Curated annotation (Swiss-Prot):
Its main location: mitochondrion. Contains seven structural repeats of about 35 residues, where each repeat contains three helices. The repeats form a superhelical structure with a solenoid shape. One of its GO terms (biological process) is mitochondrial ribosome assembly. The lineage of its organism: Eukaryota, Metazoa, Chordata, Craniata, Vertebrata. Binds promoter DNA and regulates initiation of transcription. Required for normal mitochondrial transcription and translation, and for normal assembly of mitochondrial respiratory complexes. Required for normal mitochondrial function. Maintains 16S rRNA levels and functions in mitochondrial ribosome assembly by regulating the biogenesis of the 39S ribosomal subunit. Belongs to the mTERF family. This is Transcription termination factor 3, mitochondrial. Keywords: DNA-binding, Mitochondrion, Ribosome biogenesis, Transcription, Transcription regulation, Transit peptide. The keyword 4Fe-4S does not apply. Highly expressed in heart, liver, kidney and testis. Detected at lower levels in brain, spleen and lung. Gene3D superfamilies: Transcription termination factor 3, mitochondrial. One of its GO terms (molecular function) is transcription cis-regulatory region binding. It holds the Pfam family mTERF.
Length: 417
């Protein structure tokens, strides 16, 4: 068993003490050269106790210095052998036998060190040893936040560097547990390379993964198949990149679902293939969101607001958000524009962006123009004001070019409302 860092000094002192004792015994017994001592030390008078320790040190912690020491000891042994070559042959033979037995004893001593049991955890230690102990903080068995695991997880650390907001992911326990089980090199690296190939920039990866953390549970080959399907429908690489950025969950849907969604909009709206493709590129969440708001709004335009089918087609291709807009907002905006401002359907169809504007902004500007006597929305009459200019330009230009008044006058009027 290998010795721990705390056990080395203690074993070093004990072995060194034993080597000194054996060295003393060695001196007394030198007159009997054929006899050897236990614990791996040979009966050669010219080998000091320090050399003996370095030569037969810890088996587990052998280093280059130990090897050099053993080499120097070997050279000393060779000098001794040459010096004793003039002695009787029996003395040389006895010396060789002694060295062989000593090497065998050293092997036994090393094996004995290896088999020594570790120190007991209840054994007292000094203050210096206690200070040197560095204990890692324990991994919490359970937690409500991923912050407790960041120091222990390389995956979480690298996701944070990418800009992933773990505080949002931890609100979904299943997703948080999934991240803790993932290996960055095996499970996440290839996914990041795939997303970059699709068109997600480095500075967009953090926000994308924060929103669509479920993509890590998707099979990479399935994701590639879905991208290939979009390309087969003549969506360019730039189109796919734009769609994935605007609708991060797009790639989580199967090819069958994507195909059904494209077919629904082409059939329901009676659009051409190109117009259907342009529609979903501008608003890709049409492929990922619920179809119920779309179906409901189509009924509202036809039955409640009174638009014709071709008029609906024109408006939604201009402003795709009209398909998913809030029903109440649509009806309130139409009621004010059509019934209060007296703007007919055919003019509203030409400027459908009015449905994408905050209603209070339309009301404020219309009431200010009415106060000034300039609320004229009939293109056949002079001083005509289009809906486009009414809702799209900033206050400074509206006051200067449309209302022919100052911004201060407009602000004073708003205080009276």
């Amino acid at each position: 068993m290998a010795l721990s860092a705390q056990q080395i000094p203690r074993w070093f002192n004990s072995v060194k003490l034993r080597s000194l004792i054996n060295a003393a015994q060695l001196t007394k017994r030198f007159t009997r050269p054929a006899r050897t001592l236990l614990h791996g030390f040979s009966a050669q008078p010219q080998i000091s106790s320090d050399n003996c320790f370095l030569q037969w040190g810890f088996k587990t912690y052998r280093t280059s210095s130990l090897w050099n020491s053993s080499q120097s000891t070997s050279s000393s042994s060779q000098e001794n052998n040459s010096a004793q070559s003039s002695l009787l042959p029996s003395m040389n033979e006895q010396s060789q036998k002694t060295q062989n037995i000593s090497s065998f004893d050293s092997e036994l001593f090393l094996e004995e060190l290896d088999e020594l049991p570790p120190l007991s955890p209840m054994q007292p230690i000094s203050e210096e040893e206690a200070i040197q102990i560095i204990a890692d903080p324990p991994l919490p068995p359970a937690s409500f936040t991923l912050r407790d695991y960041v120091d222990h997880s390389e995956t979480l650390q690298k996701l944070v560097l990418l800009g992933v907001d773990l505080s949002k992911i931890e609100k979904h326990p299943e997703a948080a547990n999934l991240l803790l089980r993932l290996d960055f090199e095996k499970d996440i690296k290839q996914m990041l390379l795939f997303l970059k190939d699709v068109g997600i920039e480095d500075n967009q990866l953090g926000a994308f993964l924060t929103k669509n953390h479920a993509i890590f549970s998707e099979d990479l080959e399935n994701l590639k198949t879905r991208v290939a399907y979009l390309h087969s429908k003549n969506f360019s690489k730039a189109d796919v990149a734009q769609m994935v950025r605007k609708a991060p969950f797009l790639l989580n849907f199967s090819v069958e679902r994507l195909d059904n969604r494209l077919g629904f909009f082409q059939k329901e709206l009676e659009l051409s293939v190109k117009k259907t493709r342009d529609l979903v590129v501008r608003l890709p969440r049409l492929l990922t969101g619920s179809l119920e708001p779309v179906k409901e709004n189509m009924k509202v335009y036809r039955l409640e607001l009174g638009f014709k089918h071709n008029e609906i087609q024109h408006m939604i291709t201009r402003i795709p958000k009209m398909l998913t807009a809030n029903k109440m907002k649509l009806t309130e905006t139409f009621d004010f524009v059509h019934n209060v401002m007296s703007i007919p359907h055919h003019i509203i169809v030409k400027f459908p962006q009015v449905f994408n504007t905050r209603l209070f902004k339309v009301k404020e500007r219309h009431l200010f123009l009415t106060y000034l006597g300039r609320a004229q929305y009939d293109p056949a009459k002079p001083n005509y004001i289009s809906l486009d200019k009414l809702v799209s330009i900033p206050d400074e230009i509206f006051c200067e070019e449309i209302a022919k008044a100052s911004v201060q006058d407009f602000e004073k009027f708003l205080k009276t409302l």
